[in-house]
């Protein structure tokens, strides 16, 4: 099965968790909104200065020019958080800090570096007069009421992710709590008789430390889920059935297994899923990760990943990541995809899509450039991390999904 078709099968089999919970707004970063949030007030509520400078009546400086400077008296100072009590009189300016309210009568701000402070050598706090050599335009360098948010404006819609900008707006509006979708629970079941816990004091030469489960747990967290790590299950069909049933007792929204999903003599994971439920697909026309399967057991989706660390990571990103984001109620579940120019040729088997990690960077003249990463080259310092989709021998360009920002 093609991986795009596999994605469709998985997403069509899932329903968002649909359970909301209310969290304090400072804890909502990265969560998915379950309600529409409206701005309770204009932000800002009054005109504020965007810069450190001088509040001015634009009409007083309308004729200012380099050859015809306008001299105005400094009537005082006003800092951020201080109420403007006096009206700005014609022929005067008021030294203001960034975020300070504009006094009545002022309708513009001149940045201090664009004014000549008198007497010369004085600083802003001790200025007595200023010379303006360029006109002030009404509203210049001023935050007007509602510039950042207007009362009644939609700040968040259901399915929106609370990013830093949204969090800043919510906090600035004094919104104390937010209804968000519950994070999906993901049970992670590593399989393999050769595995020992990653932190085991000792591992025999014929054994392997189980790193997959820990890596997948971190990916689950990045995708917005809550990982539940389960004990290692051996390569035994009956034991795997029992391990799957015990995993379902933890009420996961998704069960992810690693290992035993191919066709080797000791690969029993897919068979155990078939014994207990339904296998919707097994085997993908991809490399790595041909031994990947998906099914349902007691209504719980089960994603069976390969046992290799890199293969498991890649297939989770391609299939598990969008599934988890869909379960979590996100509106957009797929990573952005671009067409990239390859810095070296890449080969792929006929009829198979090769999934290849790559480092990507933007070049103003050539567009996206992709450098394939090989087995031990995991990092992309200063560049995007991405995944190439090679559908045939590619010498020039290939599709790529963008993952980690530089």
Language model: regions and residue ranges:
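Short, low-complexity N-terminal leaders and the immediately following helix N-cap/first helix
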Residues: 1-66, 95, 107, 331-355
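Hydrophobic, low-charge alpha-helical segments
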Residues: 319-329
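Short, glycine/charged-enriched hinge/interface segments at domain edges or termini
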Residues: 55-231, 245-246
């Amino acid at each position: 099965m093609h991986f795009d078709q596999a994605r469709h099968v998985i997403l069509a089999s899932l329903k968002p968790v649909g359970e909301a919970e209310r969290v304090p707004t400072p804890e909502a970063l990265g969560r998915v909104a379950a309600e529409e949030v409206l701005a309770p007030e204009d932000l800002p509520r009054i005109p504020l200065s965007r810069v450190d400078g001088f509040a001015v009546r634009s009409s007083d400086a309308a004729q200012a020019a380099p050859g015809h400077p306008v001299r105005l008296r400094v009537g005082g100072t006003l800092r951020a958080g201080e109420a403007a009590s006096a009206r700005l009189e014609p022929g005067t300016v008021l030294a203001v800090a960034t975020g300070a309210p504009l006094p009545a009568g002022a309708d513009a701000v001149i940045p201090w570096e664009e004014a000549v402070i008198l007497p010369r050598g004085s600083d802003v706090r001790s200025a007595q007069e200023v010379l303006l050599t360029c006109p002030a335009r009404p509203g210049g360098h001023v935050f007007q009421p509602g510039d950042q948010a207007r009362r009644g404006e939609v700040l968040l819609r259901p399915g929106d992710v609370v990013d830093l900008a949204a969090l800043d707006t919510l906090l600035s509006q004094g919104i104390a709590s937010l209804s968000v979708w519950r994070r999906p629970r993901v049970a992670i079941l590593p399989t393999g008789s050769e595995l020992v816990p990653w932190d085991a004091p000792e591992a025999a030469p014929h054994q392997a430390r189980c790193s997959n489960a820990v890596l997948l747990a971190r990916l689950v967290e990045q995708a917005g889920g809550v990982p539940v790590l389960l004990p290692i299950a051996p390569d035994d069909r009956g034991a795997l059935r029992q391990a799957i049933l015990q995993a379902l007792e933890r009420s996961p929204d998704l069960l992810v297994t690693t290992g035993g999903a191919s066709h080797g003599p000791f690969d029993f994971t897919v068979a155990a899923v078939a014994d207990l439920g339904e296998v919707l697909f097994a085997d993908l026309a991809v490399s790595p990760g041909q031994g990947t399967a998906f099914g349902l057991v007691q209504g719980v989706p089960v994603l069976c990943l390969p046992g290799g660390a890199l293969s498991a990571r890649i297939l989770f990103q391609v299939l598990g990541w969008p599934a988890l984001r869909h379960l979590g109620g996100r509106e957009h579940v797929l990573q952005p995809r671009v067409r990239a120019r390859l810095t070296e040729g890449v080969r792929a088997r006929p009829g198979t899509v090769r999934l290849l990690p790559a480092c990507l960077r933007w070049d103003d003249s050539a567009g996206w450039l992709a450098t394939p990463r090989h087995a031990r080259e995991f990092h992309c310092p200063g560049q995007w991390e991405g995944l190439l989709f090679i559908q045939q021998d590619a010498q020039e360009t290939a599709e790529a999904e963008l993952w980690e920002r530089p």
